[in-house]
Amino acid sequence: YKEIIMRYSKLTMLIPCALLLSACTTVTPAYKDNGTRSGPCVEGGPDNVAQQFYDYRILHRSNDITALRPYLSDKLATLLSDASRDNNHRELLTNDPFSSRTTLPESARVASASTIPNRDARNIPLRVDLKQGDQSWQDEVLMIQEGQCWVIDDVRYLGGSVHATAGTLRQSIENR
């Protein structure tokens, strides 16, 4: 009888210790918060947001920074807004600053982010297959996380006959 009581007393001591230990551990969320975001947000992962951006641009055929704001990082939106008031950037911004070519594409297909090996990455470059008539080319968008939002932070021009002054949108605006 004494042996049974000893076994149960050890068990009754073990249960509160296990509960206390589990209360002291923390769970790390899958996506960490990367600061704040001052602008509106588009729902979805990096590839989904990038595809929505290109779909919106093809449908509306406009470079209106205010309308594109939910898709752009705070820094890129500020750079584009400042550049729109600078005559040196007028040609870049009246053409298509988000593509290697001067004219807007008719179609765009963003590569899947599932091919990215590091799922915790905060900067995700995604290839974009663009098409206008019989011409096809490829560019790359850099997606970053601001707060809980995935947004475009830069465009790398890979499409051959580049109209911009540098290899990326940011470099072209910053005159690098």
Listing of model-derived features with the role each one plays in the protein:
Residues 4-13:
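Bacterial N-terminal signal peptides that target proteins for export
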Residues 20-23:
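C-terminal motif of bacterial Sec signal peptides marking the signal peptidase cleavage site
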Residues 25-27:
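Bacterial signal peptide processing site
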Residues 34-91:
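Core segments of small alpha/beta cavity-forming domains
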Residues 77-136:
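Surface-exposed, charged secondary-structure patches
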Residues 142-144:
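Short beta-strand edge segments in extracellular beta-sheet folds
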